[in-house]
Amino acid sequence: AASAMAQLDSNGTGGMLQARLRGNRVSSKQLPLGLNTMPADFINAYVLGSVGATGANAGACATFLYNLRLAVEDIQSGRRRVAVVGNAEAPLVPEVIEGYAAMSALATDEKLCRLDGSSSPDHRRASRPFGDNCGFTLGESGQYFVLMDDSLALDLGAQIHAAVTDVFVNADGFKK
């Protein structure tokens, strides 16, 4: 489990970077809370007490999918019988928004209107993976999956919601 950007608010990296400028001290929690693997590390150490593997593969907006693929491969190979895969991302802080805006990476009303050839933006069409787009829409999300090999799920009487046989992650090509 991991996030691509880590915790950037005042409790994490954002607070650590701004503390001295604001006349505050850096807390002992800001650096660890700013690590992109802290959600998994925290749950592993403080909730589950697990001695199993923890780690992450970060890949921008596909971070969850990269980690899901690793878990599926571990279960299919027999290295693991159960895996918890997750991601939580909350990058809506002014510095991140300004950073993406400076890169012209965000979909704006002006760019949406130009792309659609209209005078008013249709925000429902702002996110268009693998298609013509004018940037992306910054958002927050969180999801966690518990994966088990077939026999373990049946032995435990687990309620099975889906099967993940493979995971495909593809980039969406050249950007304009």
Language-model regions: role of each:
Residues 1-6, 76-92, 97-99:
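Internal hydrophobic scaffold segments of catalytic domains
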Residues 1-3, 7-8, 66-70:
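Conserved active-site "lid/cap" helical segment
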Residues 3-53, 97-117:
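Active-site-proximal gating segment of KS-fold condensing enzymes and close homologs
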Residues 3-5, 59-63, 87-92, 166-171:
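Acidic, glycine-rich active-site loops and adjacent beta-strand->loop/helix elements
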Residues 24-25, 33, 90, 124-127, ...:
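Domain-wide signal for the mature, well-folded portions of proteins, strongly enriched
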Residues 36, 40, 44-47, 54-89, ...:
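Active-site-proximal alpha-helical scaffold in enzymes
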Residues 65, 90-126, 169-175:
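Active-site-adjacent elements of ketosynthase-type condensing enzymes
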Residues 114-176:
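Condensing-enzyme catalytic core mediating Claisen C-C bond formation in acyl metabolism
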